[in-house]
Regions:
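N-terminal amphipathic alpha-helix/helix-capping segment at the start of soluble metabolic enzymes
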Residues: 2-52
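N-terminal small/glycine-rich loop or linker at the start of catalytic domains
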Residues: 35-62, 128-150
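Short, well-ordered coil/turn segments that N-cap beta-strands
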Residues: 37-40, 81-83, 121-125, 170
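Glycine-rich, proline-tolerant flexible connector loops at the mouths of alpha/beta enzymes
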Residues: 54-64, 82-109, 136
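Catalytic domains of carbohydrate-active enzymes, especially glycoside hydrolases
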Residues: 69-89
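Alpha-helix-loop-beta-strand connector modules within alpha/beta enzyme cores
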Residues: 98-129
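Acidic, His- and aromatic-enriched active-site or binding-groove loops in soluble protein domains
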Residues: 107-115, 148-160
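Single conserved hydrophobic/aromatic residue that forms the stacking wall/gate
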Residues: 130, 163-173
Length: 173
């Protein structure tokens, strides 16, 4: 490899000068990312039961909110400066089917939560929802399954319908 002199630096590429990052202030000065609360989307889990908050055992510190508690929880997040939330349902197992029909119910947990939040906050908070079938399917797959295979075309048709039933909430996506 050919070396050449760089004024004030020395022989490049043998000597490659770089900014010293030993001190916190220099690391912060040259950091590529500066994350703030305004960069986050809070995942909010909702359930249809009577308890306002239900712990999620697999995620310590995370709770599922009832439909009447989710507005208060999101209100606190808005006060903290969190600009957007994403709603994820904990669908009652009795409503889960192989064809995930509950996904297309305009009164499913996600639709109810989004309507309440839109009414409470208008456009002051971004509202997102996962366009997915796994919360509604009895087999846990994110698609329609027949004979062990996910049927992509049939799944896409249902996902498009899912988007359309969410449209009245005017999601921020």
């Amino acid at each position: 490899m050919q070396e050449f002199d760089v004024a004030g630096v020395g022989r490049f590429p043998t000597v490659r000068m770089r900014r010293n990052r030993h001190h916190r202030w220099t690391r912060e000065m040259v950091a590529e990312q500066h994350l703030t609360v305004k960069d986050f989307i809070w995942p909010v889990f909702v359930h249809g039961g009577p308890e306002r908050e239900v712990s999620v055992p697999s995620m310590p510190g995370v709770v599922r909110y009832s439909l009447d508690a989710v507005v208060d929880a999101v209100g606190h997040a808005v006060e903290l400066g969190i600009p957007a939330i994403a709603i994820f349902p904990a669908t009652d197992p009795s409503k889960k089917t192989t064809l995930a029909e509950e996904a297309l119910n305009p009164d499913n947990l996600v639709c109810q939560a989004l309507r309440s939040l839109k009414q409470a906050f208008g456009n002051d908070v971004g509202l997102l929802a996962d366009v997915a079938l796994d919360p509604y399917s009895s087999h846990g797959q994110d698609g329609i399954v027949r004979d062990g295979y996910v049927l992509n075309d049939e799944t896409l048709e249902i996902l498009l319908s899912l988007i359309h039933i969410s449209e009245p909430t005017r999601l921020s996506w």
